[in-house]
């Protein structure tokens, strides 16, 4: 719904299947030792394919995921190239003894949105140096502190959201910034729930993630105007399905000269 309301595309990729029949991203779990799947290469190639196939913005591509997907977010930020502009890991962490190669030495500062439950008993907020299942992993504070320092942020604004459900699971936001106009901010949202997106009912975390990403969306619509077009063949939506023209949606206009016009009619 947030994508429909704000006119951006969302892709939900699936990782490969492990020996137990579960889909996963290869982030360095102990029980995946020896797995050589290159998920960084896969996701960056997928992003490039979607950008070129559907004329999506190369400069406004972001990455988020929960749990294993959150850990993939961290891995991409440290070891990936510059395909993704900002990251939003949810209930994730980093496994320093796993496959990561550029821990604390990423290519460039990037904006970071982190959300994690203080009562998460799957991926503990404080980390675990001797986990017998996943492998040792870092605390949320360690990772947030790194990105705050790496991004040269010195200002902190703390807000506590109203406890709308009166359940004591208050969400608190910590927003790190600097006086520079182009600073790569780091936001941390903590809640009193467990290993989830933050289901305390006080905020919609997906909306907060989009609010953060949209801060770094340059030329957000990036509509490529074509001066001279031939005959229109058909119109498709983001999924390649033929549709009729409608308002407030990304549509692709296919012409008989091979060109495609991406357009949004706003009403």
What do the predicted segments below correspond to?
Residues 1-62, 66, 72-75, 79:
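Serine-hydrolase catalytic machinery in alpha/beta-hydrolase-like enzymes
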Residues 8-14, 26, 60-65, 71-76, ...:
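Structural recognition of the beta-strand scaffold that forms the well-ordered cores
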Residues 15-20, 118-121, 150-155, 193-194, ...:
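Acidic glycine-/aspartate-rich tracts in secreted/extracellular proteins
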Residues 33-41, 78, 134-138, 199-204:
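Soluble non-cytosolic domains of exported or imported proteins
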Residues 202-219:
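Catalytic active-site module of serine/aspartate enzymes centered on a nucleophile-bearing elbow/loop
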Residues 250-267:
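C-terminal tail/sorting-segment detector
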């Amino acid at each position: 719904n947030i994508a429909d309301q704000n006119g951006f595309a969302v892709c939900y990729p699936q990782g490969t299947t492990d020996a137990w029949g579960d889909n996963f991203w290869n982030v360095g779990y102990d029980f995946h030792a020896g797995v050589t799947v290159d998920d960084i290469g896969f996701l960056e190639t997928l992003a490039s394919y979607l950008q070129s196939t559907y004329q999506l913005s190369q400069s406004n591509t972001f990455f988020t995921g929960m749990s294993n997907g959150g850990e993939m977010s961290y891995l991409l930020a440290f070891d990936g190239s510059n395909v993704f502009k900002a990251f939003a890991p949810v209930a994730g962490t980093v496994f320093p003894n796993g496959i990561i190669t550029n821990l604390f030495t990423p290519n460039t500062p990037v904006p970071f949105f982190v959300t994690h439950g203080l009562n998460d008993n799957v991926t503990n907020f404080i980390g675990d140096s001797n986990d017998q299942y996943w492998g040792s992993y870092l605390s949320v504070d360690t990772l947030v502190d790194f990105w705050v320092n790496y991004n040269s942020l010195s200002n902190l604004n703390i807000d506590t959201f109203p406890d709308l459900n009166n359940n004591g699971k208050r969400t608190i936001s910590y927003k790190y910034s600097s006086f520079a106009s182009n600073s790569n901010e780091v936001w941390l949202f903590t809640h009193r729930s467990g290993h989830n997106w933050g289901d305390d009912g006080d905020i919609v975390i997906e909306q907060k993630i989009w609010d953060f990403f949209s801060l770094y969306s340059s030329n957000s619509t990036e509509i490529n105007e074509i001066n001279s077009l031939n005959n229109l063949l058909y119109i498709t939506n983001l999924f390649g399905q033929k549709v009729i023209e409608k308002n407030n949606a990304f549509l692709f206009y296919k012409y008989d000269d091979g060109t495609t016009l991406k357009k949004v009619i706003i009403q």
